[in-house]
A protein has these predicted regions:
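Single-residue signature of alpha-solenoid repeat helices
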Residues: 206, 240, 278, 285, ...
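Register position in tetratricopeptide repeats
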Residues: 233, 267-271, 311-312, 345-346, ...
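Conserved active-site neighborhood of the chymotrypsin/trypsin-like protease fold
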Residues: 19-89, 94-98, 112-113
């Protein structure tokens, strides 16, 4: 029986145990939309469905695992032939109903599995009940045809061999099931699952996957780190601390445990430093990475040391560390980017910052150029500070392309300002219009557009845009100032002066000068 999130029954069906540790097979449909499921065996014992072990929506079948030990039926390893006898075994607490059947046809799929077709009238309420052969082995589970009166059965061997992969958490069918997927048996796939679960928006499944990973790989640091990150996200720093201390005791590679513990502390101190936790500080993070480096002196640990040094405000020292690392085996674009940030904090000439960002970009593998997106954005911002506005616009545009246009209204507003200073007015009008389209209730963008229209002598448009700005924000002085200037330039001096006075009342610093200029 499957249940909705509110506890109401979603669907009921049947299934077969195929393993000693709760492994079972059934049809898929009852699980779609389910938040939980409970299996009742032939003795009336109830067991929670803990994990979905695999699904196939084409054949509408699923493999899952329940809590507790189970007594399985044997699954046939060889196909039953057309014309052979089979028996449909329906569920019952005392004595099951057995219906004899003859295999009408057998279709082979995926070169090795069988899809059985029967012509028989089946008892009610037998969906997903097993068909067994003369040896009592399960050959498939019952599925009514959607197009004829025939009865179908998908090979039980196929269903028992269903399994999850590293991408199962992103599978569209799996997403419709509230019960967590099982962890793949292959460690590399399990690691991929762990990573994908952290990115998916399902905290219940994420927590289950992390727990399973720790149980399955108790000497690997990845599960403990993922659990500590969950605690960190919830501001439960004490639990995160205990989790990483457990990792240090249990994992095989102690250096990795100290390294990941350092990163957890660093992330808390950098991104959540407004929430105090006495046991942690940047010195503690540095202590942990030093322990890792003492066990296994590798450059990636030195990079963590440099990041902590930067976070402590020791910018020159951090710069030297980042630049030293560019001469090691881990030379990569991020190191030059880190170094550029140090130079900015040291108030170095902007040309030095730009040179380092140039290196970050040129060091990026051309096949992975999307990774250079933040470097183009940083260089665009650097160009703006040096009044190199056209170069800035080019880099903003490269950034937009590299992130597939996944930018917000503020991005277009910022690029528009660079375009105005570069005298690229047509592009600027397009960008500020795009910003308004993405954030139609932001008065700043209307004021910016009206100001630009005023600049390029589009007076009617400037009046319309400024009026819209005032409608959105009646207390926003910029709207009145620009509207007043546009009206004066259009020949409507009386209304224009009135709006300049309104801008002055609202505290616009330029309003008085404009009033004096146009009063003459």
């Amino acid at each position: 029986t499957t249940y909705n999130a509110d506890g109401t029954v979603l669907s009921t069906s049947h299934g077969v145990f195929v393993g000693n540790n709760g492994e079972a097979i059934s049809d898929l449909k009852p699980f779609i939309g389910a938040s939980k499921a409970i299996v009742t065996d032939s003795k009336g014992r109830e067991m929670n469905v803990e994990r979905i072990m695999g699904v196939n929506d084409i054949y509408d079948v699923a493999k899952f695992k329940v809590s507790g030990k189970t007594i399985p039926l044997n699954v046939a390893q060889s196909a039953s032939a057309s014309g052979s006898q089979a028996w449909l075994v329906s569920y019952a607490e005392k004595s099951p109903t057995i219906t004899a059947a003859t295999v009408k046809n057998v279709e082979t799929f995926m070169d090795k599995y069988s899809y059985y077709i029967f012509s028989l009238t089946v008892p009610e309420n037998t969906n997903a009940c097993p068909f067994v052969n003369s040896e009592g082995q399960v050959i498939g589970i019952m599925q009514p045809s959607t197009t004829s009166t025939d009865i179908h059965a998908t090979d039980a061997k196929f269903i028992t061999e269903l399994q999850t992969t590293g991408l199962s958490v992103e599978d569209e069918t799996m997403k419709k099931i509230g019960i967590p997927p099982s962890l793949p048996t292959d460690k590399s796939q399990a690691l991929l699952t762990l990573m994908m679960a952290a990115q998916a928006n399902d905290s219940i499944k994420h927590a289950a996957i992390v727990s399973d990973f720790i149980n399955q790989y108790p000497t690997s640091v990845d599960g403990y780190t993922a659990q500590a990150q969950i605690y960190l996200d919830a501001n439960d720093f004490e639990s995160a601390e205990k989790e990483m201390e457990t990792a240090i005791k249990k994992v095989e590679n102690k250096d990795e445990a100290h390294y990941n513990y350092s990163k957890i502390i660093y992330n808390k101190e950098v991104y959540k430093n407004d929430i105090p936790y006495a046991a942690w500080n940047l010195d503690k993070a540095f202590e942990e990475i030093n322990k890792a480096y003492a066990i296994n002196p590798q450059p990636s640990y030195q990079h963590q040391q440099a990041l902590i040094t930067y976070a402590k405000g020791e910018y020159q020292k951090a710069y030297d560390m980042f630049m030293d690392l560019t001469k090691t085996s881990i030379r990569n674009p991020e190191l030059f980017y880190n170094a550029s940030q140090c130079k900015q904090m040291l108030k170095a000439p902007m040309k030095e910052v730009i040179a380092l960002l140039d290196s970050a970009i040129t060091t990026t593998d051309t096949l992975r150029l999307r990774e250079a997106a933040p470097y183009f954005l940083a260089r665009a911002e650097a160009y703006v500070t040096t009044d190199s506005f056209r170069q800035a616009v080019f880099d903003y545009t490269r950034y937009e392309i590299l992130v597939n246009g996944n930018v917000n209204a503020n991005f277009y507003y910022i690029r528009e300002q660079a375009e105005v200073k570069a005298k690229l007015y047509q592009q600027a009008l397009i960008d500020i219009s795009t910003a308004i389209m993405l954030a139609p209730k932001e008065p700043t963008y209307y004021a910016e557009k009206a100001s630009l229209e005023l600049r390029v002598n589009m007076m009617d448009d400037a009046i319309k845009t400024a009026t819209k700005c005032i409608e959105l924000a009646p207390e926003y002085a910029d709207g009145y100032l620009i509207l007043g200037l546009a009206q004066i330039n259009k020949g409507d001096k009386a209304n224009g002066m009135s709006n300049l006075e309104k801008a002055k009342e609202l505290g616009h610093v330029q309003a008085q000068a404009m009033i004096e200029k146009y009063s003459k």
